[in-house]
Amino acid sequence: MTQISLELIPRTRSGLRAELAAVREHFPSVGTVNIPDLTRFSTRSWEACAFGRPHFRTIPHVRAIDLNPGEALPMAEPMAAHGIEDVLIITGDAPSDMTRRVYNVDAEQAIRRFARELPHVRVYAGLDPYRQSFAQERDYLERKLDAGAVGFFTQPFFDLRLMEAYADLIPEGAEVWWGLTNVTTEGSVNYWASRNRAVYPRSFEPTLEWNRRLAGDALHFARERGQHIYFQPIRTDVVEYLGGIL
């Protein structure tokens, strides 16, 4: 059965609580919340996920480059205390000003460490359709599965045809969470194209209507395949974006 997650940004704790309450009120089909670990905010992802328990299954993002190999995993105890049993591990980008200490740890190494030290935790990895060739990304996915990942959260897609291509490449048996987001300003269009090298179809329009139509089509795509989906509302009211779709 298809599960649905919302990716929420922990800008403030009060704001996050309000968003979680809105999701509970308007979207009873949403059973999961995933939260990125953004170093510009004071609340770490696993701390933010605690606010969603026990009403939601919560999945904190963990940046591999933040994990000090010589110290205990800082999220292990908070996760256990709040019954958080899933993580999404990405390598992470180094801070531009280098004021924050990072380590020479990649996603594969971090996945192996979680599998070794927290074997009860389900580990997801990232799938990025824009960073390298199809064959290179497929091989990278297989290495992360070998390291101990159970499945993948994808970067947001903007084209169902590209989703179909990757659906055929993902190793059989891996759990998949397809990613969608809303891009409704020229700034967002340029950000995704330049920073993440996203590919837009010719039919793309930076309107809420176009993004809502894609969200509905992608949800149907995931349900047809028995896979999962998450939505990443960016500076948009989640009810306006997904109301009537979920």
Give the ranges of each region predicted by the language model:
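Extreme N-terminal starter segment of soluble prokaryotic enzymes
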Residues: 1-5
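Glycine-rich, positively charged N-terminal anion/phosphate-binding segment
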Residues: 17-23, 39-54
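Active-site glycine-rich loop that binds ribose-phosphate moieties when present
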Residues: 109, 133-147
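Conserved, mostly hydrophobic/aromatic
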Residues: 7, 33, 79, 144, ...
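Structural motif
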Residues: 28, 82, 147, 224-225
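Glycine-rich, proline-tolerant flexible connector loops at the mouths of alpha/beta enzymes
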Residues: 27-48, 89-102, 149-163, 231-236
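Active-site pocket-lining/capping segments in soluble small-molecule metabolic enzymes
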Residues: 6-18, 27, 88-95, 100-130, ...
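Glycine-rich anion/phosphate-binding loops
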Residues: 64-78
